[in-house]
């Protein structure tokens, strides 16, 4: 599986959120039955919500200082496909998108994902690209987290 088909990197869109969740859970594991720590939405991200809505980005409505458990944030990321929560998870983990994206790219290299480049934690940026084979590698790793 993952050895046939186009090996040219193409934009992943929201599939990038699998790596966001993988990196976050690897570094902040949840125990069975736990909701994990509670984070709050930054004023900066709350202020960006109208812009994200205007661009048609997937999101959930948030307000500044709104609490989210780790589990609720991951559910919003993976079920709702909320771009704004992808950026919040990046901030909670690394302080900003750039630091988290560096971790995403380092993780891709560690896993052997040679055709993948991440440029943002949500996949909205078309510069985030990958191959089918690399996504199989990631999904196999994600199933072990």
Please give the residue ranges for each predicted region.
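Active-site-adjacent loops and short helices of periplasmic peptidoglycan-processing enzymes
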Residues: 1-133, 140-143
